[in-house]
């Protein structure tokens, strides 16, 4: 629903042009050798069923999986997702349907499945700052604070390597902010956001390791921030 995307007749703006969705999905499906998936919202507004129309059109054009976010385009990122609005799409689809929106832990995943009748869930922003949530959803034990810091360092390395230093440093700020918010450390967020190159970011993370471990011991045991 981002304005810069919708201005280009892309993203959720396509819900106003179901025929164009069909053409795009058909073109992609005929051009690749892997299954094609489509993600949509429930509609342009809460009063229409454009999401269901888009899902069915995408299926008929060759999509093998549909993901539906429980908000309308008009809702943008406000309010709450409405997983129950996925039932109509589920009843008309032959391919799997995944529920998306406001899924941040096991309880919200179970809620989305129960209310939507979907075949599964897809996490988006709920995984920001806690990539280990997938292990938790599968019933596995969570990594220790030390292991989480190692994962954060690996993620930082990967962003610099994949995007290059200029873009990697910029993108790392967003992800590190998500990590640090979950650890309840606003002062550390401000410090990290001021760093201007990859070397500074690496050095900062190394220098703050012990401080972050001490903070984690409090945050995770007191339940102040979602683990």
Regions found by a protein language model. Name each.
Residues 3-21, 71-83, 141-143:
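Glycine-rich tight-turn/loop motif centered on a GG-T
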Residues 23-26, 31-33, 47-65, 77, ...:
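Alpha/beta catalytic cores of nucleotide-metabolism and tRNA/nucleoside-modifying enzymes
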Residues 1-36, 41-49, 59:
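Active-site beta->alpha loop and helix N-cap motifs at the rims of alpha/beta catalytic domains
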Residues 1, 39-45, 71-73, 100-104, ...:
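Active-site beta-loop-alpha junctions enriched in small/polar residues
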